[in-house]
Amino acid sequence: MTSRFGQLTYTSFDAVGTVGGWQVKETTDALTSEETQLMLAGVRTVFRTVEPMPDYPTPEQLEAAPRRLAYSRVGETYAALWHTVPAGADSTGRPGNVFAHVLLDRTPDVAPRHRAIQWWRSPHWLCPYGATSVSRAALAEPGPEPGGVVTKDSVVAFALDTTTWRLATLFGLLDAVAAALDGGAPVVLGVESPDNAAQWIGLLSFLMSPGTAAQLSFSTFDRADQLNLHGGQVLSAVPLEDLSAVPAGMAAISEAETLSLGELGGEPHRTAGGYAIDVTPWSAMAQVVLLDPGSARRLLDDIDAVAEQVRDSGLHPAWPMAMAVAGRAEFADAEEEAHEVIAAHSPPGVAVGSAAARTISGVLSAVVGTTTADAWRAVQELPTGPGAVFADTTYLCRAVADDAWLSNSGPIPLGPRMFHGKPIPPPLRTAIGDALNPARGPERLLQVADLLVRAGVEDPRIRTTLVEDVVPRLRDAEARERVGADARLTLGAVLLNDGDANGTAIDDGLLDWLADTAPLPPPDELAQATPWDRTWTTAALRGVRAWRRGTGGAGRDAGALLWWLRMAGSADFEQTATASAWNPEDLLLAIGADPLPGAAAVRTLVAAADSPALNRLAAKVIDENGDSLAVACAAVRTIEPTVWLQQRYVETHQHAYVPLWDEVLSVVDPADVHPDFSTRLLAFALLGLFTGHPYPRACSGFAASDRLGGEAIERLMPLVGEGHLAPHAVVAISLLRAAAPPDPSHPDVTLDELAGHLAEQVATGMVGDDNDVEGVVAVMAQLSGDSAEPALRGYRKMVTKLMARRRDSPSLTARLRGGMQA
């Protein structure tokens, strides 16, 4: 069985059969490699004393020499102590050797629990000096046990020493350490000796519980240049001489200089160096309880007794002292601060009937007072914890029964903590039963329900009361007028939020009244809503009403209809979205942050006009949707011809998309295809024609429209002007296609005619001299593969005729079919 403690020594030595130098000298208790590495990570191999050690120190000098004890939690579950002493010269004669003796606690949270500083000057620490002593030093079993130098008696005597006033320093140190334990600046204490440092650390440790002290990482001796702001050490002691060199960002306190005390809720403490330390109830209580040795010593025992009554893990450092102070007449001047700490920081799980539980209960009862306003004040002031839960519960118990509180204008206030997913405390369960008495009337019952629902209370009696006692009375128009918007939304949320997605408990008239409470929220707002909050419920009520009216009668709530089908998990959502073309805003509202399923967006992508909402929809489909039809249509709506050509999508994507575009256009009624889609697709088709890549045959119908054809040409002309489409090539391809005999298998005459119109516009921008003519002829010869003189003469004739008549004829194709044969 592995023992609780493991030991390791580390130093520079030269043993037989080993390479000399810094190395692990010895280990015990079957240390694993992981444990060894954790222990080695905290070893310091430099120990620079303020005064140099004598070459040949006497035993008395060695005993009085500085030593370093450091403590920290390591790994996930371990704690370790590093005891380091100067060791003189090593076996090679090199001065400055150090001997580190490390103790690993494998189960630091298991009894018996000691404060780590109690190991200070334990007689079991190995402290060899000189190469011979280092070589002979050997670990003993068991490992070091707590010593008798730092005890409750010693720290009380140290704090209340009549020859040296230390309490002011202690009060500032308490608050600085409390802040550091909570993630604030690490604390550096300037001391006359490591022995003083040990007593300061002991005093701090005994004024908190053993479990909290286990989180107080410390060192009794460091030099300023060894301090690490982000090293995780809470408290470091340094020689007084080093205090001025402490890195910025650390709370530096000197035991030899006067600390100016502040006031709780007022001015902070200030060190001699000007560092400000916020005053906490911990130091305020300490100023009362640490005035005489007898009461101070009893306080330390009381702190441990309190800690034993609870789970001593994560306790606030001031809480055990506050519990010890509460109810003690001799500490009456600290009672207010003690109650503040107990209310704010009491832990969960305190045993019912224990002395600690009785103290906490008494304090919390005082904090919440006797009125609803008193409880509301406590809700606002208390931080999260059992005290806050008590205040929250008390406030709701009083609020639901307080007619005057419920009659205030506006929503009844709620604190920062809710009851969502939590069991209802028994006192609140009883209060709810009384508050839902039908005799209070529908308006008051609805106010109670609104408050409870917004607080996250889940109680079936709320819905039962609304259905049986409130809804029937809301058929009266006068009764409805007295119900505010928040209460209306709460009523709707409760009636729908019971697995009744169709709202069967709500008749059409009541549903109209509820749904008209607020306008439909925009998609971005609805995407951030949480189920059954105000925004979400508004959309739900409008969605249910639209569902009842059907797709044709949904009107402006069509998006809410789709959204509600999705929220309710309806199998009809995808089918409904796919079957019709929607306003893009409605689809975006319906889908929120989720991907659109399948081909749900296809008809909308084909049938909707260009708009920012359509752009967002198309981009969402491309980014998140795996349906090929939807992605192909989204590409048409969001990618401009220039990008399509420059990014070579015409080469990499168009071949795959052409059959998809044809498939979509074969099932969508031509009358439903929006001109914006037709024009964009027609531009892609022309790019395919001019670059030798496929294009959708369905575009022939679009090309027959003068309007669509003209707009498609306008989209491509900038590509010619910027040189992305070579002008000579455009004219050459157009002339060759116009002159080719008709191909029955590819009856795309209208697209060829449109290409001819584009060529006419391109030719209009040419100079029309021999260079242009010969340039086009050369491209025609290259494309046709026929550079014989008869062919060149024919091409030249076609180009010349085009240049001569380019501004006149509206039909290039019809004109040139006969020209080639002439």
Curated annotation (Swiss-Prot):
Entry-linked InterPro entries: GAP1-M, GAP1-N2
Disulfide bonds: none
Annotated Pfam families: GAP1-M (PF20014), GAP1-N2 (PF20013)
Deleted gene: phenotype: Loss of DNA conjugation when disrupted in recipient strain, no effect when disrupted in donor strain. The recipient strain secretes reduced amounts of EsxB.
Organism domain of life: Bacteria
General remark: DNA conjugation in M.smegmatis is unidirectional with distinct donor and recipient strains; mc(2)155 is a donor strain while MKD8 is a recipient strain. Mutations in a donor strain that alter DNA transfer do not always alter DNA transfer in a recipient strain.
Function of the molecule: May be involved in assembly of the ESX-1 / type VII specialized secretion system (T7SS), which exports several proteins including EsxA and EsxB. Involved in DNA conjugation in recipient (MKD8) but not donor (mc(2)155) strain.
Name under which the protein is recorded: Putative ESX-1 scaffolding and assembly protein SaeB
Organism: Mycolicibacterium smegmatis (strain MKD8) (Mycobacterium smegmatis)
